[in-house]
Amino acid sequence: KKNANEKMYPASMTKVMTLLVAAEKLNNESLDQKIEISIEATDYSFKNECSAAGFLVGEQVTVEDLLNGIILPSGAEAAYQAAIMTSGTLEQFVDDMNKKVQELGISQTTHFSNPVGIFDENNYSTACDMAVILHAAMENEICKKVLSARNYTTSCTQQHPQGITFSSKFLNRIDRKFGKGKVVGAKTGYVNQSRYCAVSMYESEANNKYICVTGMAGKAWQTVYDHIAFYQNYCK
């Protein structure tokens, strides 16, 4: 461990908690439910200069589309809409995120102020805590499916007749570079204060599971090599 318990700003790794809190309010039957994308969701993404999944105002997408839109393209509008869908208001959803933080026993060192990972002094965590959050998410079947997806195409809508295809650049890159075992879930992020960061779970050929959390990479591709180096050097 290096700086494992130091305060960090988790950027879009925050969305692992967003996914978990939303998923725990859902079941498999609700994944096909249709949700309309609101102008508030797209405005939130635009005004905060966030990455977006590409959903449009008035578009009717499934809950499953929404959840995948949170993680693979790191869509802020998807995270916002999921928060409203499951908690009613953004403020209540953030409260629910912090209740989950308490439940996981990490409230002394982790606190969330938004579901996207927008930089805020009150949106912070540690590498160890992010590992705890990813582990909890991977125990949830809905979350596990989303976090492990390499590619996903949304359902067809009037606005996107062919759907939208999302890809996990991190997982697809690591698959090409690393052939032993498998990285079974991941989320990347970026804010100036943490540079490029990522959290991932690896399952070795011996079926042992490991979680790696890194930050301060100068380039997005460097996070891939950071995680490969960790898994090669420390995992059996």
Model-derived features with residue positions:
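Active-site-adjacent loops and short helices of periplasmic peptidoglycan-processing enzymes
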Residues: 1-128, 137-138
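Penicillin-recognizing serine hydrolase domain
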Residues: 84, 88-236
